Amino acid sequence: MKFELDTTDGRARRGRLVFERGTVETPAFMPVGTYGTVKGMTPEEVRATGADILLGNTFHLWLRPGEEIMRKHGDLHDFMNWQRPILTDSGGFQVFSLGDIRKITEEGVHFRSPINGEKIFMDAEKSMQIQYSLGSDVVMIFDECTPYPATHDEARKSMQMSLRWAQRSRDEFDRLENPNSLFGIIQGSVYEDLRDESLKGLLEIGYDGYAVGGLAVGEPKEDMHRILEHVCPQIPADKPRYLMGVGKPEDLVEGVRRGVDMFDCVMPTRNARNGHLFTSEGVIKIRNARHRDDTSPLDAKCDCYTCKNYSRAYLYHLDRCNEILGARLNTIHNLRYYQMLMEGLRGAIETGTLDAFVEEFYTSQGREVPKLSD
């Protein structure tokens, strides 16, 4: 992978990630394909929304279908018929989300399978091996996602263990002679000094890109913005910056304003299945009865298949009847909305008009523009 930085507007960056399997224009949003599929969508449909890269989930793909079946197909690209770049998370976040059915030690994590209760162990080395089997274009290190809230001491211990796991991830990645890219993950909760220590340690090890982890886990938005403003300028300019698990459209806008290059989140797809649709004028809840006889499209400014062909009334009807097509059309729209937002952000950075773009984004939704720190 090669990262090319074209231009900046304030702290925002316009560039691209160049892989053998294709180029990803940045800032980029990655739809989430947890089980090797973006729910309800074919790869062709996902691509038609403008997505250049997908995120796959190491933990879930390891449990089902497993490495052996994956290898029989070649890798995850062949298994799901997506021949463009794929980033896989390390599995750490999912393991730590298991709560009472897992035990964390220095070696790794012991847990019971949420599928059948089987005892399983995952560590940094196993995570690297699974992601190697998946053929991931971007591999993420195995880390502990520090829960929120955490005291300074709790966050420090968690971050320092993540650093030790980061070195083990690097060593195993190199031992496997994996030709793809490895990203480090900056931890430290909401504490700037711990974020500094984490980044310093990761830079000493050396990675192809750097993610900011442990945000959007319940902390106030002000803390997320503060940490991004503190951390992003310290990441080398020639390395991509990835904000993990984020988020709402405004979170993407605020992340880009603070120098983030990559995002992922289940929100556009999950919300689509629940009838929450993102538009240029804010969120539409298609289950609301006021859409029952509305012949207008979801969003007159959207060029997606759904908006070009169907009315709000039809989408309301599909939702009320619990028709699968409704969830699919909603997903197509939400994913396209996210990609159009990223296209708009990239264009604004190119032309030096990001401030105007951001103001229009918030004004159209009747909201004020959040302030950046000096």
Swiss-Prot record:
Zn(2+) binds at residues 302, 304, 307, 333. GO terms for cellular component: cytosol. One of its GO terms (biological process) is tRNA wobble guanine modification. Coiled coil: none annotated. Residues 245-251, 269-273 are annotated as: RNA binding. Transmembrane segments: none annotated. Its EC number is 2.4.2.29. Its cofactor is Zn(2+). It is an enzyme of class 2 (transferase). Keywords: Glycosyltransferase, Metal-binding, Queuosine biosynthesis, Transferase, tRNA processing, Zinc. Pathway: tRNA modification; tRNA-queuosine biosynthesis. It catalyses: 7-aminomethyl-7-carbaguanine + guanosine(34) in tRNA = 7-aminomethyl-7-carbaguanosine(34) in tRNA + guanine. Binds 1 zinc ion per subunit. The active site is at 89 (proton acceptor), 264 (nucleophile). GO terms for molecular function: metal ion binding; tRNA-guanosine(34) queuine transglycosylase activity. Substrate binds at residues 89-93, 143, 187, 214. The keyword Manganese does not apply. PANTHER family: QUEUINE TRNA-RIBOSYLTRANSFERASE. Homodimer. Within each dimer, one monomer is responsible for RNA recognition and catalysis, while the other monomer binds to the replacement base PreQ1. NCBIfam families: Q_tRNA_tgt, tgt_general. Belongs to the queuine tRNA-ribosyltransferase family. Catalyzes the base-exchange of a guanine (G) residue with the queuine precursor 7-aminomethyl-7-deazaguanine (PreQ1) at position 34 (anticodon wobble position) in tRNAs with GU(N) anticodons (tRNA-Asp, -Asn, -His and -Tyr). Catalysis occurs through a double-displacement mechanism. The nucleophile active site attacks the C1' of nucleotide 34 to detach the guanine base from the RNA, forming a covalent enzyme-RNA intermediate. The proton acceptor active site deprotonates the incoming PreQ1, allowing a nucleophilic attack on the C1' of the ribose to form the product. This is Queuine tRNA-ribosyltransferase. It comes from Shewanella loihica (strain ATCC BAA-1088 / PV-4).
